[in-house]
């Protein structure tokens, strides 16, 4: 008989709406002694069946639900079905945008909690961030090797969130032979160098793909300041779109070296591109003091809030950096500003930028609201999957 997790009265409502998390404070009792990652059934207080998921006793999220179908078993075929469904849901996008790099599995939003898989050319990069994902590692790799026989499989589970599951950080080759780094992927006719062993996240920010293309609409003949540029891909799109000048700013010299490489592999001259290894906050203040201005500024900072206790500080950080950026823009200029903090509500982010405009004594108009690329879907019952928020503002 399956191990059974009974919820407290009233705590079944989120699962009935198909939210996949069961928190420790919502559990009434546990029938049996589940092992870490073991499949368990979740029932309401009155005993009716709700879902089947993976147990993680050390985590605040003690069950992540794999399925809400009572007849569905969690086995090799389950993972194969989920991966095939996810691939089918992306095939049109891949053809439309000529993608050789994309997110194949977006964790909970693709029905595989704690599992992220990105495909970069002939390498699949996995992040296994939950106990259930970790326990099923060999099965997941076996299925991927069957479905993508020409791909190496590499793990990038080198993230702090695994500690919350009682898991150690880990990375390394899981299957096949890893090609020489960097790989070259393509999107929208643009080539991008990616190192899956050393790059941020799984190697690259695939989620900003659509926003890079949107930014390119505003840059022809303009001066562009690309802040927190990483490997310079907003600047790369800008160069291809005919920007007059581009300044790529990042604290990492390695990232800037890759930005230079990206220009070369696309056959673009970087005579009008400046690469600046600098702290963005300090540099923006310096430019303000010097009276320097730009036509277009991209602000794509790292996550400012990892938990709710950091949200107030994150709000101050976002307001400060947006205020200074607004002061650097020429009248009629454009600010593209982002938050990748999942805890930051979109409406609050817009309010922060509006308040920053007041402090900067600039009038702005929001002309577009941006989000993550469509290979990063948001499950209808999983609003936490909506993490990337962006705004395009015209500045006067």
UniProtKB/Swiss-Prot annotation:
Which transformation does this protein catalyse, written as a reaction?
cytidine(1962) in 23S rRNA + S-adenosyl-L-methionine = 5-methylcytidine(1962) in 23S rRNA + S-adenosyl-L-homocysteine + H(+)
- Spell out where the chain crosses the membrane: none
Q: Identify the GO cellular component terms for this protein.
A: cytoplasm
Q: What is its EC number?
A: 2.1.1.191
Record's keyword terms, sorted: Cytoplasm, Methyltransferase, RNA-binding, rRNA processing, S-adenosyl-L-methionine, Transferase
Q: Where is the PUA domain?
A: 2-79
Record's keyword annotation contains S-adenosyl-L-methionine: yes
InterPro entries registered for this protein in UniProt? PUA, PUA-like_sf, PUA_sf, RLMI, RlmI-like_PUA, SAM-dep_methyl-trfase, SAM-dependent_MTases_sf
Q: Which GO terms describe its molecular function?
A: RNA binding; rRNA (cytosine) methyltransferase activity
Instruction: Spell out the CDD domains in the cross-references.
Output: AdoMet_MTases, PUA_RlmI, RlmI_M_like
Q: Where, subcellularly, is it found? A: Cytoplasm
Uppermost EC category: transferase
Question: What Pfam family is a match for this entry?
Answer: Methyltrans_SAM
Q: Which HAMAP family match?
A: 23SrRNA_methyltr_I
> What PANTHER family does the database record attribute to this sequence?
RIBOSOMAL RNA LARGE SUBUNIT METHYLTRANSFERASE, S-ADENOSYLMETHIONINE-DEPENDENT METHYLTRANSFERASE DOMAIN-CONTAINING PROTEIN
The UniProt similarity line reads: Belongs to the methyltransferase superfamily. RlmI family.
Functionally, this protein is described as follows: Specifically methylates the cytosine at position 1962 (m5C1962) of 23S rRNA.
- In its UniProt entry, what is this protein called? Ribosomal RNA large subunit methyltransferase I
Specify the species: Shewanella oneidensis (strain ATCC 700550 / JCM 31522 / CIP 106686 / LMG 19005 / NCIMB 14063 / MR-1)
């Amino acid at each position: 008989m399956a191990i059974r997790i009974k919820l407290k009265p009233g705590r079944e409502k989120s699962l009935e709406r198909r939210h996949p998390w069961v928190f420790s404070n919502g559990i009434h009792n546990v029938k049996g002694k589940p092992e870490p990652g073991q499949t368990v059934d979740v029932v309401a207080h009155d005993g009716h069946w709700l879902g089947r998921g993976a147990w993680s006793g050390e985590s605040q999220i003690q069950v992540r639900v794999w399925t809400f179908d009572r007849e569905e078993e969690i086995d090799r075929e389950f993972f194969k079905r989920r991966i095939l469904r996810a691939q089918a849901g992306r095939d049109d996008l891949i053809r439309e945008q000529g993608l050789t790099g994309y997110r194949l599995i977006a964790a909970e939003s693709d029905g595989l909690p704690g599992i992220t898989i990105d495909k970069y050319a002939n390498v699949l990069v996995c992040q296994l961030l939950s106990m259930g994902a970790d326990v099923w590692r060999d099965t997941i790799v076996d299925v991927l090797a069957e479905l993508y026989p020409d791909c190496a499989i590499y793990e990038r589970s080198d993230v702090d969130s695994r500690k919350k599951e009682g898991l150690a950080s880990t990375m390394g080759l899981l299957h096949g032979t890893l090609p020489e780094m960097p790989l070259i992927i393509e999107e929208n006719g643009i080539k991008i160098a990616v190192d899956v062993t050393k790059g941020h996240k799984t190697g690259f920010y695939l989620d900003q793909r659509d926003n890079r293309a949107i930014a390119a609409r505003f840059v022809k003949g303009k001066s562009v300041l690309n802040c927190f540029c990483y490997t310079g891909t907003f600047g790369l799109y800008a160069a291809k779109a005919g920007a007059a000048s581009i300044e790529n700013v990042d604290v990492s010299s390695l990232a800037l070296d890759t930005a230079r490489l990206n220009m070369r592999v696309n056959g673009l001259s970087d005579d009008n591109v400046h690469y600046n290894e600098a702290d963005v906050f300090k540099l923006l203040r310096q430019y303000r003091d010097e009276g320097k201005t730009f036509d277009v500024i991209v602000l794509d900072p790292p996550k400012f809030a990892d938990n709710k206790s950091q949200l107030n500080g994150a709000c101050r950080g976002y307001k400060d950096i947006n205020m200074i950026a607004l002061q650097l823009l020429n009248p009629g200029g454009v600010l593209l500003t982002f938050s990748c903090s999942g805890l930051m509500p979109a409406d609050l982010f817009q309010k922060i930028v509006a308040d920053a405009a007041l402090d900067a004594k600039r009038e702005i108009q929001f002309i577009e609201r941006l989000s993550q690329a469509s290979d990063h879907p948001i499950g209808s019952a999983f609003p936490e999957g909506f993490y990337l928020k962006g705004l395009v503002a015209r500045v006067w």
